[in-house]
């Protein structure tokens, strides 16, 4: 660094926050630039967009009925009917055909709620 830039740097270190903000405004006006949009901002925004897409891919979950103990079949059948809206025969076929997906493409909250209900009824459930 040259002596001149060292001297400017030392002067800047002594400025208060209010004085520094005023200096920024004066520099923006004098040189016709803006301190609000840094050059790397575009790269950061693009990276944030890619990260958001990765998160979006994980917003849909499948609730899979893995196993139903014989003594819990009726309780699980009632819960499956409530969750899916299926008729008695369709729900019975689904429960007896485990492992089978109960709900597909649902939100994480819905998937966790369904899993909790099914587990309370005695079923073994996974969320994928």
UniProtKB/Swiss-Prot annotation:
One of its GO terms (molecular function) is mRNA binding. Signal peptide: none annotated. Disulfide bonds: none annotated. Keywords: Ribonucleoprotein, Ribosomal protein. InterPro entries: Ribosomal_bL12 (IPR000206), Ribosomal_bL12_C (IPR013823), Ribosomal_bL12_C/ClpS-like (IPR014719), Ribosomal_bL12_oligo (IPR008932), Ribosomal_bL12_oligo_N_sf (IPR036235). One of its GO terms (biological process) is translation. Transmembrane segments: none annotated. One of its GO terms (cellular component) is cytosolic large ribosomal subunit. It comes from the Bacteria. Homodimer. Part of the ribosomal stalk of the 50S ribosomal subunit. Forms a multimeric L10(L12)X complex, where L10 forms an elongated spine to which 2 to 4 L12 dimers bind in a sequential fashion. Binds GTP-bound translation factors. NCBIfam families: L12. Forms part of the ribosomal stalk which helps the ribosome interact with GTP-bound translation factors. Is thus essential for accurate translation. Belongs to the bacterial ribosomal protein bL12 family. HAMAP family: Ribosomal_bL12. PANTHER family: 39S RIBOSOMAL PROTEIN L12, LARGE RIBOSOMAL SUBUNIT PROTEIN BL12M. This is Large ribosomal subunit protein bL12. It comes from Synechococcus elongatus (strain ATCC 33912 / PCC 7942 / FACHB-805) (Anacystis nidulans R2).
């Amino acid at each position: 660094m040259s002596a001149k830039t060292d001297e400017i740097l030392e002067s800047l270190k002594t400025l208060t926050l209010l004085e520094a903000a005023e200096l920024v405004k004066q520099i923006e006006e004098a040189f016709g630039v803006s301190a609000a949009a840094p050059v790397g901002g575009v790269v950061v925004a693009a990276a944030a967009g890619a990260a958001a897409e990765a998160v979006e891919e994980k917003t849909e979950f499948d609730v899979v009925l893995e196993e139903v103990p014989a003594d819990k079949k009726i309780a699980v059948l009632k819960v499956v009917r409530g969750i899916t809206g299926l008729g008695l025969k369709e729900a019975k076929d689904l429960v007896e055909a485990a492992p089978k997906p109960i709900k597909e493409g649902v939100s994480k909250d819905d998937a966790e709620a369904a899993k909790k209900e099914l587990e309370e009824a005695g079923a073994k459930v996974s969320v994928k």
